[in-house]
Amino acid sequence: MKKILLVFGTRPEAVKMCPLVQELRARREIKTVVCVTGQHREMLDQILATFSVVPDYDLSVMKDSQTLFDVTTGVLEGIKGVLEAEKPDIVLVQGDTTTAFAAALAAYYLRIPVGHVEAGLRTRDIYSPYPEEFNRQAVSIVSRYNFAPTEQAKENLLAEGRDPGTIHVTGNTVIDALKTTVRADYTHPELAWAAGKRLILITAHRRENLGEPMRHMFRAIRRVLDEHDDVRAIYPIHRNPAVRETAAEVFGGDERIHIIEPLDVLDFHNFLARSYLVLTDSGGIQEEAPSLGKPVLVMRDTTERPEGVAAGTLRLVGTREETIYESFTELLDNAAAYEKMSHTANPYGDGRACRRIADILAGE
């Protein structure tokens, strides 16, 4: 029986790995072991509960005001004992987090094969996003299995000289997650507050946007909200104190926006399904929103998901106040522009990525 250890520690990782945990645990020929690092503690626990995933190991590395040094050393030191005790045949990591980087590095040190879920995303700038672009490139170097979500991701890996035999195009596992979480009968008091209005969903927390860039982003959003009485915004805010301070400074007193605590994945996906459009500097939502027909304004200068830009469902607007203001206003005031972005083919898969990954791992 093949033993597979899945390691993850943040909310985005959990959303994309929990459906894979469920798929692998349904396979008799695979023993599935789950280790969470707790890089994002409370938000991680929400996802685990939603998917009824109980981890076998919890490293609990999160601490107040943690740095990249803290997370990297905490995961490296904690995962070593798990790897030595379990002796897995394969270690699976997801995406581009510090957890993924450190766990893959630890597996490499012990000569354990690494599988990388969502491999091949690239901006080619290791400081944008930071540190995610470096993390995912580093994981690819040590991976024996590269599960690329799209053909473009595969081409990125081939361009770097990766062995074609290690690359498998599977689609993105977040689409699998949406099949579980989005529900027709869902209700929530915040959605009732926005009933009859066009709902804008905001997510913003990116490390490189902290400070003045985020202030510009928020000012643009507030200007648009002040000019459109039929629009309401909901911002499930990140726990980073720097994000909260800037949001309070810019949005304070504006009755058209509700700043709420982070949502669990079931709530978030259902808010997303009922939104009019999304403004974000996040990565994963660039995949989730197109699957639900929602236009996305990406408040970043680069994206590792060019498929959405090419398909027309994502638009890069950077962090300049005027650019965000103009694009946001256009989608609210120009019905043709909105329709063009909201009716595009989803480039990120068909909801069967987990099955494909499990088939590959079981067949090796």
Language-model features: where?
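Nucleotide-activated sugar donor-binding and catalytic core shared by glycosyltransferases
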Residues: M1-Y235, A242-E364
